[in-house]
A protein has these predicted regions:
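Short beta-alpha connecting loops at secondary-structure transitions
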Residues: 22, 107-108, 145
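Glycine-rich phosphate/pyrophosphate-binding beta-alpha loops
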Residues: 89-121
Length: 172
């Protein structure tokens, strides 16, 4: 798989229209939504310094946690679908800070096995988080506080990810 990029390929404007996503099947909604979470999450955990991207990423994670289950369960929920479009756009903005292991593995595995990129990110997410715990724990604990999980620990956030995956039907 090759990534092709050039600044002239960037759009001049982006239109977020939730009505265009209403027919998306639940499994695809879940997988693409988890891809949005992975963009925000990996941007937050990137070791590079970009405080604005971090703030955007944290809010993008919150939006995914709140609205992805709704968008997946009720495909005609325009509010949930709109907020997921916003979370996705936030992730695309935030990942200028960088991505990480989830995407490095998902790109390669997707090319080898013709597997959906978002689904691979969702499957890999808890394992990559756990493997990188020592490097990202402080940021993840801050995110757990922002998400108001009731427990600001890395383990609580990891459980949040596992619970979200289970609710969405993501394989373990």
């Amino acid at each position: 798989k090759k990534i092709i990029f050039h600044p002239l390929m960037l759009p001049k404007a982006v239109v977020l229209d939730p009505e265009l996503t209403v027919g998306l099947p639940a499994k695809l909604t879940a997988a693409t939504g988890m891809d949005a979470l992975s963009h925000n999450l990996e941007a937050l955990c990137s070791p590079f310094y970009h405080p604005m991207a971090e703030g955007i990423a944290v809010e993008g994670c919150r939006l995914v946690g709140r609205y992805l289950p709704r968008a997946t369960a009720r495909g005609d929920d325009l509010e949930a679908r709109m907020q997921m479009l916003v979370a996705s756009a936030m992730g695309a903005t935030a990942f200028q800070k960088g991505l990480g292991g989830m995407h490095a593995l998902a790109h390669s595995l997707g090319a080898l096995y013709d597997a959906h990129h978002g689904l691979l990110n969702a499957i890999l997410m808890p394992y990559v988080l756990k493997r990188n715990q020592s490097a990202i724990e402080e940021r993840i604990c801050r995110l757990a506080r922002y998400l108001d999980l009731g427990d600001d620990s890395f383990e609580a956030f990891l459980q949040w990810v596992l619970d979200l995956r289970r609710e969405l039907g993501i394989p373990h």
